[in-house]
C-alpha cells in the first residue's frame, strides 16, 4: 500500500488509549482454581474489572504439542491476571508494517505456544450476568484475543454483560491432521471447547451465569461456532450464537480428511520429518522450532483464498462419529440455539487487495474492463470447470455493456461481490435457510421442539471514518467488529458522533440477542424493529447502517446464491466421492462438476 494511505497511524491509537484510561486499582477474586488478581477502573462512568491472561488449560508444549488440550490444574499462589493473553504461534502479516490497516490484525502481545488463556471484562457489580464469549477470526492461521479492536470494556460497561475472549491454537499447532493420537486434527476446536467448559465451571466467580452463555465470532471464529453446533461435546455450552461473516461451509474454512492429510504430509516433507511411521514423524516434528513450522506452512501449494491448516470435516475427538459437512445437510446439529447470521456489503474487497494487488491495491477506486474481469474470474476460480466460470461471468456481468475494452468501476465492484458471495455470504445465507428448514421440521406436531429457536439475518453496510483503507473499500470483511466492541466510544476523538450513536445501537442489538435471543433496542423506532428470518416476514434481513438506515430490507443475492449453492452441492458430491472412494482423483471432481452444469447454466 502506498504511504499516502497511511492516515491513521498507530500512535493515534496509543495516545487515545492513554487519554481514555482511568486510575487502575488491583482487585483479587477467589475461584475454584485459586486466587486471581485483576484490575478495576472506571470506564464511561461504570466500574469495570478485567482479568487478562487467565489460564484455562495446561500449556500445549513439548510432548503435548499437536495433542488435545488438558484441563488447567489448581494453583496455590496468587495468579497475576493483569497482562493480556499471549497470542498463539503464528506468522505476521508484512503487507505494510507502517500501515495500520494491516498492522491492526497482527498480534500485539507475546507470541508463544503457551497461549491457552482468556481475557475477561466484567462490571464490578456483576451478579448472575449474561456472558458473551468472543471467537476471533484470522483464517485459522492468525489472530489473538488481545487485539485492541477486541477490547471488551465498552461492551461490558454499556450493556452490563461479561465479555470473555478465548484463545485457540492456530496453523499446524491447532489443525495438523494425520488421523493419529499425536496429530488428531481440530486441536484448536478442542481448545475452544475446553474454554467453554472452563467458563461453564468458573464464570460464576466473576459474576456470570453459566446458563446464560452466548457466543459470537467473526470469519474463522464464526465458522468455529458452526462446528460447535455440530460437535456432541459442545452441546449445552451456549444458548445463542452470532455468526459474523463466516460459516463452516465456507470453502476456506474446512478440509476433507484427504486434503488435510495431504497438507500435513507436505509439511512433514518440507521440514524433513517424513519418516516411515507417524510416531517417528511426530517425534521429529515436535523438535522443529515453531518459527520454522509457521513459515514452512506457506510453502504448501494453495489455491485462491485457501488457507494452510483449517478444520477437518471428520475426526475422532471433536466431531466424533459425525461428518461435519454431512451433518449440516442432514440437520444433525444443535437446534436449541438462537442464531444471528450476517454479512458485510463489501466482503470481497479486503481479499482482492491482497490476492489481486495489481488491480485493487490502489488509493483511487479501481476500474476493470470486461476482458480483465473475465480473466480474473478464470484465475480466481481456476479449479472450477470452464462451464462454471462461464456461468459466473454471465451472472455477474452487465448485458448492456458492449464495449469490453472500456474500464469501469462496475466490474471492479463485481469482483468484490463475486468473491464475497462465493467465499462468504452465500454460505451464511444457506446456513440460515438450512437452520430454519430443520426448525420447521422439528416444530411440526410430530416434531421435537415446542418453542423453536429463532433466526435473524443482518446486512452490514456502514463504513468507518476511522478506517485506514481508502473510502472505496466500503464495509469490508471484518470492519463491523469495531462497532460491535464499541471502539468509537473507546476512541471517541477519531470517530464522528453519528458513528458513536450507531455503535451503541449495534452493541444493544448484540447484547439483547445474547440475553434474550432477540435483537432489540431499548428505545425503538418503528423502522428499527428487527424481523425474524421466516416465511411470515418474507425472509427479510436487517440493514445495519448509521442514521435512519437501520431498517428491514428484502432478501438479496437470490440469483447469485442459487447459482453458488448448485456449485457447492456439486462440490459436496465430489467430496463424498473423494472421501469414500479409494480410486478418487482430482479428475473425478472435475467430471462430477461438469455433468450437472449444463443444466445449471441453462437455468440462468
From Swiss-Prot:
Disulphide bonds in the chain: 88-115, 273-284, 426-561
Catalytic residue list: 219 (acyl-ester intermediate), 347 (charge relay system), 477 (charge relay system)
Q: GO molecular function terms here? A: acetylcholinesterase activity
Q: What keywords sit in the KW lines? A: Cell membrane, Disulfide bond, Glycoprotein, Hydrolase, Membrane, Neurotransmitter degradation, Secreted, Serine esterase, Signal, Synapse
Q: Which domain of life is it from?
A: Eukaryota
- GO CC terms of this entry: extracellular space; plasma membrane; synapse
Q: Where in the cell is it found?
A: Synapse; Secreted; Cell membrane
Where does the UniProt annotation place the signal sequence? 1-23
Family assignment?
Answer: Belongs to the type-B carboxylesterase/lipase family.
Q: What is this protein called?
A: Acetylcholinesterase 4
Q: Per the UniProt entry, what species is this protein from, by scientific name?
A: Caenorhabditis briggsae
Q: Point out the gene that encodes the protein.
A: ace-4
